[in-house]
Structure formats: structure tokens, C-alpha cells
């Protein structure tokens, strides 16, 4: 009897309206006779996945080139199938296999469901259940020769959905559960064109590169190597005829306050003259900067000086035991002053102590009492204050008196006071970055400077009038807005209806106010990335409060609840979750972190690390904590930011528990897998996935996987498909019942 082997080879369909995923896969007919020297079959490998998209207004043409490799010793045949996301308006669909055009059969959702369920029954693998309820394209693929490559090309056109002027493009990339190996080469390139000037261009799913070409065009790119994608690619964009565009995205479930994102971005015009700014570069030349650190700092400063705009003014302050300004005033960025600045930079010598307070005060002194120019300080240091004022609170208090200044700090290495630099940045509406010894300081500084090169709107104020009440907005203090950049504000709201929003600030020396009409929805549950991004920033804010100001019960409890609900797992949040569930005496079968809960040695190690998180201000673990917090506080994409924050936390753990030690092995157990699927967090314990909503529910029902009762449950709750697709053993809450799905 033939058996079916499901081998996923890519995600080919786009769902611009539906937030569900659409995955392409091959069902390979396994031969009756299988040579004993080659059993079981090795899955097909995706060697390349290239996506090219052209969007004109709301019309998107998506072209996909994929190459698949059959590593088996036998010829294979089967069906290539891909589900159509709900609501997608697909037109002009074409497909090539091995260079030949083929016709795909379109099956309606009821017939497609039968195919999905048949495969699940035979394979005893529920991964396809997330597609139940979708139409399906199906085409036969033959032959798939042994040890050969099979190229497949797909092209389709669709009309993208616009919600109050915000257009969404979705390309399903989440092939983690299907891919046999990481995809060697993966790229997504989008050429975007609009009749009106483009404003916000934002991906809530991936870190993308955005290159704008004038006011109406942009190219968006994402590339990776050896990746198993587990997040669909999503792009949100808008147009606006005003100098600054503002768009609102909401998420409002029943019975709860809403969540929102505000996207603010300046429109771009090649003819616009860059606004003038004042910049002071403050460089640490103390003895500890000797070697590569000072050389990279010099290269970074030369780059910044050479890239000053024509109307900018600048100053350079070198400091070690004392501060030494070059010009003692702001000077024009003409060729003569740039030449003198580069000569000054060339003469830097690493010697002496670290007079941080004096250096920053020297920088702030050159700011005129009355000026329309944005005033920016770029501060590079690798040490702690050892000369002059050394009390961090006093240093921060003195700096805050210089209102209007923005101090962007770069901490180099691990001997920096991260709390001091973070508080300086927070108090001046800027941010801090930390550059490790093995990282490229020049690249970090030059990338940052390119970002802030052209101010668009400074000293921002946002007023959301009307009956809707907003709260817990992050960032709490709005930073300045620069050309080519955008501001993403995440918050909560109560109420619903139309709001007149006013965004004001200084643009080119003039106060300007922009007015927008926004609508806060009474119910909307499509953009489920919105609450998780808000929660990521909120957790960053709460942990920062604990790290800087001390722990309270309220801070701890809210951090724990958000981390569990949204799957924001780091060593620190894992510890809080375990301790909370222990205190509440949650049954072991329902616990999120069962292995850590049952291992007292692991809990002791993580508890020790939690104490270090609250107390460490410098050192490898102190810098790791700061970088982890920055990943959360300034999150643009929740999945990437959570992964980055967790990675930084683990790096800090490694400093306290070197690799190969029992402590390191125990600490590594914290990183058990969690997934955020269709608005819910699930935690993996062995071969079981546990719904974060499943605790404290009395009514429970056990259902055998792959039984008729199992498929009836899916029929009754079609929304459960993506959750059931996690595996054969799932603990899942639906309505008032917790279902224990088990083999």
C-alpha cells in the first residue's frame, strides 16, 4: 500500500487581507518497494527561495523562484499543493516546473479540507491543519529525479487591501515545520511605487533594508542564509501629501482594552534642502582605549565629519583626565574646519583617566542659548567616570538641565556603566548602544549617523484628542524624527471612535503642527502582531524600572503575566514565570516551564542570575543586560526583538557560567521552545505544547489525536487549526474547556 510523505518546499501564496498563512508543499507518492539500503526517504531540500515583488499603488505582482533538491536514490513523483489564504484576491496565476508551464487545479475549501485531513490521518502529522477552510491549488509533479534539482517558478497578481490608507502586503514564509534543512539562500525584494508621496514603510515581521528613491518610490529588501523561516513576511505602507504622514493600526479584542501602533514618517523629496543641525562629537581617549578601539573610533569620527551637511555646525571634544575641545565653539562644516577636525582626530593618543562629566559639560557649553538648530551630542566611551564628578545620579541631573540636547551614547567594551549611559540617553530623548570588543565600532557609528543625518521634525509632541483614552505608550518621550526614518509608537486605548490627532514639532526652525483624523476600532482582531509588539516594549520598560530603580511586587507581577501571555521568554522572564507558578501552586502538568520547575539546581542558577540582573551595572553581564533591554524597549518587530533580547541575556549568563560547566548546562535549559501562534503563546514541554491560557480552568476533556472526535473538534472550532498544527500533543483552551490532545 502506498504511503504519503509530506515534504514542504516553500510558501507561495500571499494573503494581503487574511493574517493566516498559506504554505506550499509536495505530497510524494512513496514506491511500494523501498530498497533497504535507503530507508526512510530523506526529505526534499529547499536550496534557494527568491521572492521579487512589484507593487504599484495597491496592485502587487509577486514572482517566486525556488529550487528543490532530491537527495534520495530514487525517482519521486507526487502533487505540489498550496493553500489560498482566506480573502486573498488572486489573479493571473501562472506556474512553471522545470521550465515548462503547467496548469494548476483550483479546489474549493470543502474539497481541500478533505485532502488536508486525509494527509493528516495517513501521516499522523497535524501540521497541515492550519490550512483547513482554504481553497487549494494542486498540480502533479513528475518526475523528481534522484540527486537532481527541480526549479519551480510562480507568478501571481493580486489587489492589496487598504485599511484607512494603510496597505498591507503579506508573503507566507513560515516553513519551519516543513523544511528538512535551513534554506541556503532566501531573499525578498519589493519595488514599491505610489502615485502620492510614500510615508510609512514598516515591516512588523522582519528587519528590512529600506532605500527610498525620491518621494514616490522605494525598494525594500530582506536577505538571509541558512535560515528556517518561521514568521510570515509582512509589509505595511502608506502615502501622504503632507510633510509627515501618520497612520494608525489597532487591535481590539472583545472584553479588553485595545492596542495600537502609530506610524509616523516624513515624506521624502530629492529637492528638499537638509535642515541644519549642531553636532558635538565627544571621544574618549583614555588609556584603556589603546589599540583597535581608538583606531575604530577615529575612523568613525572621520566618517561623521565628512558627512556633515553644508549648513551644519560642529565641535569635537577629546577627553581623558581632562576635556579638550577643538574649537571651543560651534563652527561651520566648511572644508577648512573639516580639515582641522581630521587633523585633531589623527592626533588622538590613549592616555590618562576618564573625565566623563567634564567632557559632557564641555559639549553642552557650546550650545547657544537661542537656536533653532537641533543639538546632538555623539558620545563614545569605554570606561567608568574616574576623574571629576563620579556620582552617576549627579552626572545625570546636571545633564538634564540642558533641555533640548540629545546625547547618543556608544559604550565600547564591557567596562562601562550601562545604567549611567542609559539614563543619560533616556533623560535627553536619545538612546544608547553597546559595542562589544569583537564588533565593528566604525560600522555601528556610521550607520547611526547616516540615520540622523537629516532632521525632519524635532521636539515632538503628540495630542490625541476626543473620547478615546490612550495609555502606556512607548516610547514614553517621543524622539526626534529624521528623513528616511520613522517613529513607531505602541500603546493601549479605551473606548472607540474618531480622533483628531495633532503632531507638532520644529521643522527647519519653524514650529509646525500636522492634524490627522484617526479611527480607533471597537473590535478588530486581524493584526495580532500589534499587542505582542506593545507587550515586548512594555516588558522592556518594566525590566528597566526593576534594573534601575529596584524591584516591586507590582513590577514583577506585570512582567510575569505579560511574558507568559505573549511568549516573551528570556532567562529572567523564565525565572519569574517559574516562581509565579510555584507560588500559585499550578499543577505541574499545566506549568509553562516544567523542566525548570522540577530542577532545583537550574532554578538556583537562574535565581542567582536574576539577582545579578538587578545589581550589575558593568561587566560582560551588565552590558548584556543593557543590550537585552534595548532590544525590548526599542522593538520594531516582536519576534526578532525577543530573540535578540534572549540571546543577549544568554551571553550575559555565559560570562557567569562558562560553556561546558554544569551551571551552563542547567542555565541552557531555560531556553525551551515557545511559539506565538494566532494571538496565543504556547510553551513546549517535551513533546507537548501547552496553551498559556490553559491554567486555572476546571473543565477539562481528553481527546485522542487523529480520532473522529479530534476532527470533529476542528470542525466545531476552525480557528483552532493553527494551534492544533503545533503537534500531536497539545493542551488547548477553547471557550471554557481545556482540551488535552494526546497520541
Regions found by a protein language model. Give the residues of each.
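Exposed acidic/Ser/Thr-rich ligand/metal-binding surfaces
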Residues: 65, 133-137, 141-155, 164-168, ...
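Short glycine-aromatic motifs
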Residues: 88, 196-198, 208, 364, ...
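Pro/Ser/Thr/Gly-rich intrinsically disordered low-complexity regions
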Residues: 4-7, 12, 16-52, 96, ...
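Subset of Sec-pathway N-terminal targeting signals
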Residues: 19-261, 493, 504, 550-584, ...
